[in-house]
């Protein structure tokens, strides 16, 4: 019987789900807003909120617990230094999920998950290689 067994499988193996939540939580901490499916956003929310609660408590043991779940040193630093201070006076509810319509290709419900009181300038920050005019000239 599966009484009180929570969480969605999202048609993935356990290791794939773990990797998915690690990557999405790192992206959310970095950009403070990401677009994903509604089901993934609903599963990601408690994962990230527990990380912020660990960061608010501080300490070496909590930092190691957060690192075990996140495994991204730069985002871990931002989590403990920036986000923990930002949400020090807030008791939970650090994220919000906003429905973003239907994806055209497969009709999946999309959603934006973002931090409450987020830094608007963090969105799209260093999101990959950027082509410069020199790169375009060399390719031609």
From Swiss-Prot:
* One Pfam entry name: Ribosomal_L17
Sorted alphabetically, the Gene Ontology cellular component annotations on this record are:
cytosolic large ribosomal subunit
Q: Which InterPro entries has this protein been placed in?
A: Ribosomal_bL17, Ribosomal_bL17_CS, Ribosomal_bL17_sf
Where are its TM segments located? none
Which keywords does UniProt give here? Ribonucleoprotein, Ribosomal protein
- For this protein, what is any one GO molecular function term? structural constituent of ribosome
Q: Which Gene3D superfamilies match?
A: Ribosomal protein L17
Query: From its record, what is one biological process in GO terms?
Result: translation
Q: How does it assemble?
A: Part of the 50S ribosomal subunit. Contacts protein L32.
Task: Please state which protein family the record places this protein in.
Answer: Belongs to the bacterial ribosomal protein bL17 family.
User: Which named protein is this?
Assistant: Large ribosomal subunit protein bL17
**Could you read off the lineage of the organism from its UniProt record?**
Bacteria, Pseudomonadati, Pseudomonadota, Alphaproteobacteria, Sphingomonadales
Gene designation:
rplQ
